[in-house]
Amino acid sequence: MRGQVGDLSPQQQEALARFRETLQDLLPTLPKADDYFLLRWLRARNFDLKKSEDMLRKHVEFRNQQNLDQILTWQAPEVIQLYDSGGLSGYDYEGCPVWFDIIGTMDPKGLFMSASKQDMIRKRIKVCEMLLHECELQSQKLGRKIERMVMVFDMEGLSLRHLWKPAVEVYQQFFAILEANYPETVKNLIIIRAPKLFPVAFNLVKSFMGEETQKKIVILGGNWKQELVKFVSPDQLPVEFGGTMTDPDGNPKCLTKINYGGEVPKRYYLSNQERPQYEHSVVVGRGSSHQVENEILFPGCVLRWQFASDGGDIGFGVFLKTRMGERQKAGEMVEVLPSQRYNAHMVPEDGSLNCLKAGVYVLRFDNTYSLLHTKKVGYTAEVLLPDKACEEKLQGLGSVSPP
């Protein structure tokens, strides 16, 4: 038995009745109180009544905190409306809404320089609520229950800039919210045009997805257009994605339905952005340098960093050691990212490097040019690992988009 309306075992039917009885105080506050809604929470916790009740009560708290009953009327800041990608394409063969998330054309740093993290996350919560509202409209239209959504993630153009920590944290928090507050609502998460960097990106958000959600991930290979129409009818897909749908003016991307993002104009940038919090702090003496070693065990990992300085600008470069177990001078190592001076005392810096070789990579903060001033540097450095299963899946699919 699948634990759905019309397909319940006697034990599941009894659990549903007991669940409803336990929630008498909560039922009037729920967006829905029918069997379909309650069974979603029971299935999410394998019909464990206590765990299901705890999950639903926490969701009600979340609804109140986020004022979800009014969120569909909430207007995101203009910069998010114009430059945060995504859109409802249409419906799959069963009538479930299909949402496209366009990753590669997004300008994560521009968005975060122009809007708050809270508004970025709230926009994604609004999308979830909007898609559930679409499910209700589809249920009324089709005369049968529609309660799941399809999400398509277009990864073409995914690059190191999309692995910027604040941007990744938005998707980590989004998937955590999806798991905790929208159980059993995702039908499929479809990945198209995934580049070689995708396993690293996936590994950053995977732990925020439940096991059942991970099972719903479908990665399409080089023939993704032919495969995508097995999930969604061509007349519900833009020509850009292998369908037949266009805008009234013939645009194959259907810009009236899907926002493709783009570079955020600097006029939207806010001047009062908070400085990031760093994990480490070091004083780099006048005429000296400081090295931070990071061991890369195998190719394909990404080295990511953030830093800011006090007391003036600071030199920064990335090097690969040629001898282990001893400190090497810059001239004795392989220069991977050329050293240059950054005005990190004015604007915090961040970056990342796709490590093509294994070895010890050195982040070098250089103050050798300053004979008068010491510099205080706050920094965070971390190694991002690819998800090996995902990497093998991409390799098995053969033709994928270039990195």
UniProtKB/Swiss-Prot annotation:
<feature type="domain" description="GOLD">
    <location>
        <begin position="275"/>
        <end position="383"/>
    </location>
</feature>
<dbReference type="InterPro" id="IPR001251">
    <property type="entry name" value="CRAL-TRIO_dom"/>
</dbReference>
<dbReference type="InterPro" id="IPR036598">
    <property type="entry name" value="GOLD_dom_sf"/>
</dbReference>
<dbReference type="InterPro" id="IPR051064">
    <property type="entry name" value="SEC14/CRAL-TRIO_domain"/>
</dbReference>
<dbReference type="InterPro" id="IPR009038">
    <property type="entry name" value="GOLD_dom"/>
</dbReference>
<dbReference type="InterPro" id="IPR036273">
    <property type="entry name" value="CRAL/TRIO_N_dom_sf"/>
</dbReference>
<feature type="domain" description="CRAL-TRIO">
    <location>
        <begin position="76"/>
        <end position="249"/>
    </location>
</feature>
<keyword id="KW-0446">Lipid-binding</keyword>
<protein>
    <recommendedName>
        <fullName>SEC14-like protein 4</fullName>
    </recommendedName>
</protein>
<dbReference type="Pfam" id="PF00650">
    <property type="entry name" value="CRAL_TRIO"/>
</dbReference>
<dbReference type="GO" id="GO:0008289">
    <property type="term" value="F:lipid binding"/>
</dbReference>
<dbReference type="Pfam" id="PF03765">
    <property type="entry name" value="CRAL_TRIO_N"/>
</dbReference>
<comment type="function">
    <text>Probable hydrophobic ligand-binding protein; may play a role in the transport of hydrophobic ligands like tocopherol, squalene and phospholipids.</text>
</comment>
<dbReference type="InterPro" id="IPR011074">
    <property type="entry name" value="CRAL/TRIO_N_dom"/>
</dbReference>
<keyword id="KW-0813">Transport</keyword>
<dbReference type="InterPro" id="IPR036865">
    <property type="entry name" value="CRAL-TRIO_dom_sf"/>
</dbReference>
